Amino acid sequence: SNVKMKKVLFTANLDSFFIKFLIPQLKYFKDNGYEVHVASKDQGIEIPYCDKKFDVCFTRSLNIKDITKSYTTIKKILIENDYELISCHTPFGAAIPRLAASKIKNFNSKIVYTAHGFHFYKGAPLINWMIYYPMEKYLSRYTDSIITINDEDYNTAKKKMKSKIYKVHGIGISREKFDIKVSASEKMKLRKELNIVNDNFVLIFPGEINNNKNQILLLDTIKILKEKIPNIVLLLPGYDLLQGKLQKYAKQNGLYDNVRFLGYRKDIPQLLRISNMAVSSSKREGLPINIIES
């Protein structure tokens, strides 16, 4: 049939962002007959429910060359595809597509921006207010709706932004995914694979390894705790954006036996089951999703 399928585009900075937060949304549109497109920096991760993947690098770097390149790429994608809806996530993954859309004549796709925590808030570094605040304020006029996930963001947006503002209570987590039964033998197998013995006290912090998540703080904490609890082990499942810097730090500080860098994992619910305690060291998160998940 020549009935054109409705198309939706999701944008975010990294592939891993989709895996962590957006699978239910991708599935929803796929189940409702949309052709689902995704634009983000390619990390070689298979994204489910995605019909077409564009590799666009919406970096956090304020490098003009990078920004221009991603701007040109996404503008071309928007012109060629006539999306019914564009769902934007992460500051630059949302800013660059909206900027591109604002420069397209007769552009009529709906744009929804989900702010998973604005980078400007009471007590945020001044530089954040100088960069992100004017950017978000300016771009809000090219946005049909902004969805915020906490009160402070909602109130700031209500006062300052030119767009419909909504608030949802957090981004939600999938209960079924975490309400799993893990058999004793599965746990044993996983412990063995991760080289964890029975008397180990296991901490876990799932999340991308980056400066904002501040995992180095946990390594320093382990160094102190190790004196009291020699059998302590920290699991760090997550894509490494610091190019092995943290591993080196662990080695230099004699923590290599106490920290497991697991890379990107799909079995977080199982890993939580073999851990004694979930921890978080993020500098900028309200109620971190990993603490709720545990």
Positions of predicted regions on the chain:
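Membrane-proximal helix-turn-helix segments that form the acceptor-binding/catalytic region
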Residues: 27-31, 129-146
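Nucleotide-activated donor-binding/catalytic signature segment of Leloir-type glycosyltransferases, i.e.
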Residues: 247-263
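Short His-centered aromatic/hydrophobic patch
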Residues: 88-94, 115
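Donor nucleotide-sugar binding/catalytic pocket of nucleotide-sugar-dependent glycosyltransferases
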Residues: 54-55, 137-187
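Nucleotide-sugar donor phosphate/pyrophosphate-binding loop at the beta->alpha transition
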Residues: 20-21, 65-72, 110, 120-138
